[in-house]
Amino acid sequence: MKTFAYLGASAAALLLTTSHTPIQGCTRAVYLGPDGMVVTGRTMDWREDLRTNLYLFPRGMERSGADSGKTLHWISKYGSVIAAGYDIGTSDGMNEKGLVANLLYLTESVYTRPDDTRPVLGISIWAQYVLDNFATVREAVAALEGDTFRIDAPDMPNGARSTMHLAIPDSTGNSAIFEYLDGKLIIHEGRQYQIMTNSPSYDRQITLDDYWQQIGGLVMLPGTNRASDRFVRASFYINAVTQTSDPHLAVAGVFSVMRNVSVPLGITTPDQPNIASTRWRTVSDQKNRIYYFESTLSPDIFWVSFDKLDFSAGAPVRKLTLTGGEIYAGDAAGEFAPAPPFKFLFE
């Protein structure tokens, strides 16, 4: 094919090897608009209902990275609103400083080394650890780049392996991608890292995207549900939609990109059994501190305005229940009710 004439050998090999790789879903994209308009969108693609609920966590919560043994302990500096999967861990969320955490599937993740004696941090609380402790990406990278702890990753309640990687953008538009490969933490930091999907590892995703950048999104874009194709489409569209400081248009633009990379409900692919339907989408307006949520099963989008929430130390944990068929529309900040915090899943 003519297009392959421009493709280096390594990228060509990636196209061939990833075309038959089973995929777990999820896509994340960061919109970098004018006047500090930073908006992050993500899809949650999973093969079953994750029984997701939203939680408001105040400042001053005492946390541990595991139930016992050598682990991390901290008291949360920042409050956050998070989406909990199965009520056992934080999969997505934003803290009161506009730092967002998006946890996505990555088959290639290997967290431990032989005879690893580093302190343990459960993968269920990994994203929450970042939201609790840091206001910016730079702060988080400075604290984590020493690779001083290892991730504990027990299987999910449905038996799926909890192999994940973490993306964090802040309100300035800076981003970082954290991956554990062969027991070593790999970090990519910079405003250019707007997109994250799933397999292969991030350095290989960038190689594939570089190839498609040469072709140009107006000429041709890959259209399957594979992670590498979703990466390319999100990379093109997040910068092709209207670039504006108007929050309503910016949020609408990000939602449109997230829908473009979503997997239709009920889709199954016989030769790629791990492709999963999109269950929900979130969009975080990091400038105005508004967290938007859209369930595939709901006719409405709702949002949570942080200015209407109480994150003060000593305030109760609050929960917005989504698992009972509840339908919300508009600003749901007032619908959160006091509730006990869920128990994070540890080994």
Predicted feature residues:
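Aromatic- and glycine-enriched pocket-lining scaffold segments that form the walls
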Residues: V137, V141-F178
